[in-house]
Amino acid sequence: MCIRDRLTDSSVLTGLANEQAFASASARQVRALGSSGDVLLVMSVDGNCANVQQAIVAAHEREMVVIGLSGHGGGPMAQSLRDTDIHVDVPHERTARILEILMLVLHCLCDAVDAQLLGEQEETNR
């Protein structure tokens, strides 16, 4: 489930923000769209984002697994993860470096999902 695409859609974001605080925008979408066995991927540089924390709570209510990507130890986000969840923390102080590594992790995850769904394919020289 991709919440980010929905949060960058200005009409969805405006509607959610008008109804309730922005901090619960992702949690509302997880509750509406998430199911047991789904995986929620969240990312927060320092783990202090209330929106992310509430989405994790909503995912756990739905018996979903959460993959949390963060830096600075993950803060409250990391503390809200369960033993069955996955936490990837970038041990660096500079936000720019943390974001660069988290983007690399996201690309690696996408590649792994592609390999699982489509099988290993050799790239040809262009």
Model-based region annotation:
Residues R4-E123:
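Glycine-rich phosphate-binding loops that contact phosphosugars or nucleotide phosphates
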